[in-house]
Each structure stands twice: as C-alpha cells, then as structure tokens.
Amino acid sequence: MNCSIQYPVRRNTILLGLSLVLLSGVLQLGVAVATITLVLVTGIESILGLGPAIFLAAGAFAALPAGRLMDRIGRVPVIAGGFGIGAAGCCLIALGCAIDNAVLVIAGFVAFGAMNGSVLLARTAAADMYPEDRRARAISYVLFGALFGAALGPLVFRPLFAGKDLELDTLVIPWLAAAVMALGGLAVALLIRPDPRTIALELHAAESPNRPHAPPAPVSEILRRPGVPSAVIAALASFAVMVGVMNLTGYIVVGHNHEQADVFTVISLHIVGMYALVLVIGALIDRVGRKPSLVTGLVIMAVSTIMLVWAESILWTSVSLLLLGLGWNISYVAATAELVSHASPLERGRLIGTTDLAAGLLGAGLALLGGVAYTEWGVAAVAIGATVAVVAPARAILFARRPAAAPEPV
C-alpha cells in the first residue's frame, strides 16, 4: 500500500488507539455511576436507566452531525472536539454533584454523551488508512486501545470510592478526574496527522485509478446497497442490547447485595470481553467473512444475556458481562468493516454516523425500558427481553435473501 509508505499510518493508528484508551477509561465511570448519580441528585429511585439514556441519546444525536462534519472537514477536528465537549460535561456533572443541582448534572450527561458519540467515530478513521482486505483488522487495532482503558478506569476511579459512602460529595472528585482524562484525549487527537481522511482519499484513488470520483450519495441510497442492511441490523441490535444491559450493571450488582466497588470489577471484565481478543477477531473476520461473524456475535450475546436469569455472584455476573462484550465485539467490528467497504471516503462518516444515531437511540430506549423492567419485574425480565432482542435479528440476517447487486461507491 503506497499510502503506508508516504504517510505515518502506524503512528496514526497508535494515536487513535490511545484516544480509545482514554475514552474507555472515562466511560467506565459513566457506566458505573451515571444512574446512581442522577438518583442521588434528584432523590427519585423510579428513574433507573434515565441517566444512561440521557447520554446514550445525546451520543446518538451527536453521531450524525459529527459524521457529516468528518466527511467535510476531516476526522481529527471532530475527535478532538468530542473530547473537549466531554471534559466540559464532566466538569458540569462534578459541579452539579457539589451543589446538588440536577439541571447541571443532566447538562453534563448530554455533553458526556456527545463526546462518546463523536470519539467512537475514530473507528472510521482507522478503516480510512487501510485497504479493504485489512479493514476489520484496522478497526480492531484501534478498538484494542479500549482494553487498556479497562485497566485505567479502575486504577483511577476505584481508589476514589474505596471506604466511602456513596453520596453526592463522593462523586465530585471522580467526575473531575474524568474531565482531566478527557483533556488528555483531546491532546492525543491533535497529534494525529495527516488527517486519516486525506489518506483515505489517496488510497481510494489508487485502488480505482480509472474511475472518476462521484459526489457523495444520499444516505438513503447507501442504505440500499447489498450488504448494508444486514450490517446495520447487526450494529443496531448488538450496540443497543450491549449498552442497555451494561448501563444497568450497577444496580444489578448492588441489587444482589454486592458492594458498589464491585461494579468496577464486573465492568472491567465486560470491557475485557469487548476488546481483549479484538486483534484476533479482526483477523478472523477478514478471513471467514462478515456475515457469519455478524450472526456469531449476536448468538454469543444471546447466551450472555440469558445467563443473567440465574447469575447472582460476582463471578457469574462477570462471566455474563464478559460474554456480552465478546459477542458485541464480533458483531460490531464485522458491521463496521462491512459498512465502510460499501461507502466512499466522503460517505463513510455520514453512514457510520447514521447507524450510530439509530443504535444510540435504540440503546437509550432499551436502557429506559430495562430500568422499568428491572424495577417492576426484576433481572429476569431484563435478561429475557435482551435475549429476544439479539436472537431475532440474528435469525433475520441468517435467512435473509441477498438482493441483486446495486452500484458500489466510486
């Protein structure tokens, strides 16, 4: 690949991975205490799932404009801007906890979610720099960084909770620490150059030297290209179910009479499942194909969610969440690689952004519904509902008829 010689692709890949280290570390705090933060600041226990739903919805709504902006001005400004917004959001949450102000906490959750929605588009930047037969691996290289975030999160946050009662004052310092980590992500993002979009355009021209560049197609047209619908379905189901279950983990663990600090153990192992094998998985997806990988990932997620019906110990809850992360990993990487391969460099941001918008809104809805189901009927209702939500799309993808070929991006 000529671009790998002309441009520092490896360096950019490492920096993108490092940005995911910091994002993952920050997100662990949100996953562990977002629900409890909002309950404490409002005093209303019936709003389980609302905190995660707020930042999931915010991330979803940020994803599409962030994707469009990536196609227009480049990947780096959007990733860096996302970290900046997230740092401001964490500061707002800390201030809201300090003065017991729910409005500030909610505003902070919105900014926190916008950071997640923007920075996760880094996987588009990873795929930009590699040829089609290596795109799943390229995405896996960057996502692997989040594994180290799984270690960074507990190292930073667990000592801040150790031996303390869970009150609003206890949450101020952890949220400020998260803001510092987000600023670190901003600094790392600004070191990425040239912008991966520039590399993608040159690589695309080298792969199709005799084909003129067409203007970006409307998203509605891209979504009709063969292979895209199945990838979108898998992306929506895997992401929505994963975040819907993950964001209730704090209350599920505490509800089984475990300590709040144990939540970080479970979440850390969940993130290990999400990312520990991602390098191997990326290579396997490139080898065995994306459609089988989409279905395999969803089936593993189904096994993990049904386990929650009887898993009460920290050990078995951790195993369930680890498998949930592993199944998501397979479906997510395969879906992203499939989507990127059916879009030109000037279409990828908006396609991934549109998918993330839908997945985030669905995830927010499932987090809210899961909170209601958990409050009214317990963990079993959450587990059974989540299992159905991944089995149905897996079956649809497996038995879908492949449509006639449609024009591919030029």
Predicted regions and their residues:
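Juxtamembrane intracellular "pre-TM" segments in multi-pass secondary transporters
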Residues: 1-10, 194-231
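Helix-to-loop junctions at the C-terminal end of transmembrane segments
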Residues: 62-74, 277-290, 374
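Intracellular juxtamembrane helix-capping segments at the cytosolic ends
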Residues: 34, 117-130, 330-343
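Glycine-rich segments within core transmembrane alpha-helices of 12-TM secondary carriers
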Residues: 138-157, 358-366
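C-terminal ends and interior cores of transmembrane alpha-helices
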Residues: 84-99, 300-312
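C-terminal membrane-cytosol helix-exit motif in multi-pass small-molecule transporters
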Residues: 153, 157, 179-205, 395-401
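Hydrophobic core of transmembrane alpha-helices in multi-pass small-molecule transporters
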Residues: 21, 102-117, 316-330
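Helix-loop boundary and gating motifs at the non-cytosolic
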Residues: 3-57, 229-234, 242-253, 259, ...
